[in-house]
Amino acid sequence: DKNLDMISGSIAHLVAATAKPVFYDAEHFFDGFRSDPGYALATLQCAVDAGASRVILCDTNGGVMPHELGHAIREVRKEIPGIKLGIHVHNDGGLGVANTLRAIEEGVVQIHGTINGIGERCGNVDLTSIIPNLELKLGYECVPEGRLKGLTNLSRIVWEYLNIQGPTGQPYVGPSAFAHKGGVHVSA
């Protein structure tokens, strides 16, 4: 198969040309897994056999549901034991954070994301949401102690640099995050 040969040749060339680890980004992996799981897994095995030290599973269209993502990752880990996985999700379905957290629960060791979720179409997973969830709710250490509060300022700097008003309701870092005002919610 030409595609498998191209994957193998590209990875082998990069491994031979550099002393650095080679990561394989499996673009459209979850779409491919949905339509042909065997072939999707074969592409990953091919990359690993050629020397890729890590495989990044990509939800390129941002359309996978968390339960589908979890199932696919479990199948990958079952079929290719010992594989080191990363995750790269888009937020087209509003599930970027949920899918990334699910991937971590399934053993993924690397996250691709951006500050404020900035990216093509509906964006990538927002690291200003992922990092606090990992630190505060799941017990991971992502940033040096005492630096978590700096995410709010970082978020604002990025929005300012882009000349965009950030959403007031942005989780963890938006001005309305954790603010309670009068009304039905407070009186309930």
Where are the regions that the model predicts?
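Alpha/beta enzyme core
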Residues: D1-L85, L101-V108
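Beta-strand segments within the central parallel beta-sheet cores of soluble alpha/beta enzyme folds
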Residues: D25, L57-D59, G86-H90, G113-T114, ...
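Glycine-rich phosphate-binding active-site loops on the catalytic face of alpha/beta enzymes
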Residues: L57, E105-V125
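Short glycine/serine/threonine-rich phosphate/pyrophosphate-binding segments
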Residues: G93-A98
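Proline/glycine-anchored alpha-helix kink/cap motifs
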Residues: T100-I104, V108, T128-E135
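C-terminal helical cap(s) of enzyme catalytic domains, especially alpha/beta-barrels
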Residues: G119-L148
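A mid-to-C-terminal "edge-of-domain" accessory segment
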Residues: L138-A188
